[in-house]
Regions:
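Acidic, proline/glycine-enriched N-terminal capping motif
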Residues: 1-128
Length: 128
């Protein structure tokens, strides 16, 4: 099994954009909520509910060049993974994002493309 698709949006993390609700609980920001809602439109394989071990490779192309000398902004790859995994669960691509299903995220990285930010996703079954 191999699924490939592209989410043509600037990648957004979930944790770094959170706001506190009235009860003090961390809530996703409007920026993340918009990202999730829009990303769902670009996922072609909704509701397949993968429940076997898979590798989710994600190449994140961002508007900001985090590797440019002097750039003080940073982005956390793990937070990008968390946001993507949550989107995939919401879309029904993955049954859950626990380690029994998302076995690995090998090959993932952050790159720069100011004119065409996106996330290229490849999901492949892992033989244990």
């Amino acid at each position: 099994m191999k699924l490939k698709f592209t989410i043509p949006l600037n990648p957004v993390t979930k944790k770094n954009h959170g706001v506190r609700g009235r009860n003090g609980k961390q809530l996703p920001s409007k920026a993340y909520q918009n990202y999730e809602q829009n990303a769902l439109m670009f996922i072609p394989c909704k509701h397949i509910k993968i429940n076997k071990p898979v590798n989710v490779k994600a190449v994140y192309y961002t508007k900001i060049d985090y590797f440019k000398p002097g750039c003080k902004a940073v982005i956390d790859l793990q937070n990008l993974h968390n946001a993507l995994a949550d989107v995939l669960v919401t879309a029904g691509v993955l049954e859950d994002d626990n380690c029994r299903i998302v076995y690995s995220m090998d090959g993932s990285c952050v790159r720069h493309d100011k004119k065409n930010p996106r996330t290229e996703v490849t999901i492949t079954e892992v033989e244990l």
